[in-house]
Design a protein with these regions (language model features):
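N-terminal signal peptide c-region/cleavage motif recognized by signal peptidases
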Residues: 25-27
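Axial heme c-ligation environment in periplasmic c-type cytochrome domains
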Residues: 97-103, 119-161, 194-200, 217-244, ...
Length: 265
């Protein structure tokens, strides 16, 4: 019994050793093969950041603002249709019949654009004009300005009792009170000067001029920039009589360009 037992033990051990070597060899072969099969997976993993970067770039490209459309000089023909709604208060040709609403006929395109922009931004406050200006594009504003600029303001009539004082202030100012002459910015005949800040005043309704000067006198401003402070600083030096005289004089002021043609004999 003891002999068989001793003889059996080496056989078992030999088989076990052989099995261990076989398993070890298999494991080594599997390890040698693993890098070859995992290489594509690594390449796939490496490709993911690039794909992620591409995906991240897509929203950025989508959210990039579109190029701003170039604004062209105003087109009076296009402006006529766009200005139709303005006619309810300002008249279809810019000559308002209600003196609380300013005449726009003959006003410069640049000035009209500037005021519409101010209404839209809220720097010049007026609930009605805010609603009118809000949907307008910059091109719309230029077209509307060009249309009204092409029209001729109808002449007004000044109060003869106020003309002398109004003319003096308009042409000479009052150096003693540090009041400059109006014509320095608005020209001697009231047609204004180039640019957006010096409007035409000829034939403007006296009631509108008076109300505007009084508002400036009382501290109302149409913006925070330096130009917007000029008229309030001047109006605060004017008396009630000064304002009435200037407003009446301006209404009766007619530039030669705005005179109606003489009747044929």
């Amino acid at each position: 019994m003891s002999f068989r037992s001793a003889g059996f033990r080496p056989a078992v051990l030999g088989s076990a050793v052989a099995l261990v070597f076989a398993l070890s060899a298999t494991a080594l072969m599997a390890q040698d093969a693993q890098p070859k099969t995992s290489a594509p997976a690594a390449a796939s993993t490496a490709a993911k950041p690039a794909a992620a970067a591409s995906t991240a770039a897509a929203p950025a490209a989508a959210s990039a603002p579109a190029a701003t459309a170039t604004v062209k000089p105003g087109d009076a023909t296009a402006g006529q249709a766009k200005a139709a709604v303005c006619g309810a208060c300002h008249g279809l040709d810019g000559n308002s019949s209600d003196p609380q609403y300013p005449k726009l006929a003959g006003q410069s395109e640049q000035y009209i654009v500037h005021q519409l922009t101010s209404f839209k931004a809220g720097t010049r406050q007026n609930p009605i004009m805010l609603g009118m200006a809000t949907p307008l594009s910059e091109q719309d504003m230029h077209d509307i300005g060009a249309y009204f600029s092409s029209k001729t303001p109808l002449p007004g009539v000044a109060d003869q009792a106020l003309v002398a004082h109004g003319e003096e202030l308009f042409r000479q100012g009052d150096p003693k009170r540090d009041i400059p002459a109006c014509m320095a910015c608005h020209s001697i005949d009231g047609r204004g000067n180039p640019g957006a800040m010096y409007p035409e005043l000829t034939s403007q309704h006296a009631q509108y001029i008076q109300a505007t000067l009084k508002a400036w006198h009382d501290g109302v401003t149409w913006g925070k920039d330096a130009h917007s402070q000029i008229m309030p600083s001047i109006a605060q030096k004017l008396s009630t009589d000064d304002i009435a005289a200037l407003a009446s004089y301006v209404e009766g002021l007619h530039s030669a360009d705005n005179q109606p043609p003489a009747a044929s004999p």
